[in-house]
UniProtKB/Swiss-Prot annotation:
Residues 20-42 form a propeptide. The keyword Phosphoprotein does not apply. Keywords: Disulfide bond, Knottin, Secreted, Signal, Toxin. The presence of a 'disulfide through disulfide knot' structurally defines this protein as a knottin. The cysteine framework is VI/VII (C-C-CC-C-C). One of its GO terms (cellular component) is extracellular region. This is Conotoxin Lt6.4. GO terms for molecular function: toxin activity. Residues 1-19 form the signal peptide. It is found in: Secreted. Expressed by the venom duct. Disulfide bonds join 46-60, 53-65, 59-80. Belongs to the conotoxin I3 superfamily. The keyword Disulfide bond applies.
Length: 81
């Protein structure tokens, strides 16, 4: 019984140490943390009137609008037809 317990403990220790090595190697290879999108949503601007649109406010009343996104500046634009 003691032999089985010793083997289980050794296997657990080896698996923990092997996991630590692989995670350390991944950090040293990467060299930087990944960049994430900001928490706040991007702003939406109506192209015809130039006004900011918030939540469900209609920017271009009575006109059909297309939404375009500029990922570099995180801005969404509405083009009104």
């Amino acid at each position: 019984m003691k032999l089985v317990l010793a083997i289980v403990l050794i296997l657990m220790f080896l698996s923990l140490s092997a996991g630590a090595e692989t995670s350390d190697n991944g950090v040293s290879r990467g060299g930087h943390r990944p960049q994430y999108w900001p928490v706040t949503p991007p702003s939406i601007v109506c192209l015809r009137s130039g006004e900011d649109c918030e939540n469900n406010t209609p920017c271009c009343p009575g006109l059909s609008c297309r939404v375009s996104a500029d990922l570099a500046t995180l801005k969404l634009s509405l083009a009104c037809d």
